[in-house]
Regions:
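Conserved N-terminal entry element of GNAT/NAT acetyltransferase domains
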Residues: 1-14
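Conserved GNAT-fold acetyl-CoA-binding loop/helix
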Residues: 21-49
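Conserved beta-strand in the GNAT
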Residues: 62, 68-76, 84, 89
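A short, internal acetyl-CoA/4′-phosphopantetheine-binding micro-motif in the GNAT/acyltransferase core
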Residues: 88-95, 123-124
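Conserved acetyl-CoA pyrophosphate-binding loop and the N-cap/start of the following alpha-helix
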Residues: 94, 98-106
Length: 161
């Protein structure tokens, strides 16, 4: 299957939002997250959130097979060295086929090409499968924190060039 990763244009944001919602819905289901107990979870973000992030300069990328988008991620610059990876999402029916790794490798190359040397990410700490996947792809666990307003623990990982 031929794939390409391209920078997202504003008119493609609704398609990206569908990928994000469908992808993160599996996480919400697994951890019992709802709009009531976790209204800011990625599975519930509105289109206006993506539009605002784009306006603020967040780099957004879509993974396409033929003409169909099956993956999404974005990067924001924290400082001269570090970028944060946001919302890496692959549609459930395309998981476990190497597409997540393809996007992650693209993020690493993008950060290096921009002069960065570190990628940070926040995840649900209790998602051991996801945490182990990032560690297998070169990330190190740097800590965790429990916030009163979240029904899970936030976990933090980073990758260095």
């Amino acid at each position: 299957m031929k794939t390409s990763i391209i920078k997202v244009a504003k008119e493609k944001l609704p398609e990206c939002l569908e990928v994000i919602h469908r992808s993160f819905a599996t996480v919400a289901d697994e951890f019992g997250l709802t709009e009531e107990n976790c209204p800011k979870h990625t599975s519930f973000i509105p289109l206006s959130y993506l539009e605002t992030q784009m306006k603020w300069g967040r780099l957004m990328f879509g993974l396409y097979t033929d003409e169909r988008i099956i993956g999404y991620m974005s990067l924001s610059k924290e400082d001269d060295e570090a970028y944060e990876l946001h919302n890496l999402a692959i549609l459930p029916e395309f998981r476990h086929s190497g597409f997540g790794k393809q996007m992650l490798d693209y993020a690493k190359e993008t950060v290096k090409s921009l002069g960065g040397s570190k990628i940070k990410i926040g995840i649900i700490e209790e998602s051991t499968v996801l945490k182990d996947w990032y560690i297998a792809n070169g990330f190190e666990h740097t800590g965790s924190k429990k916030f009163d307003h979240l029904p899970f623990t936030s976990g933090y990982l980073e990758w260095r060039v």
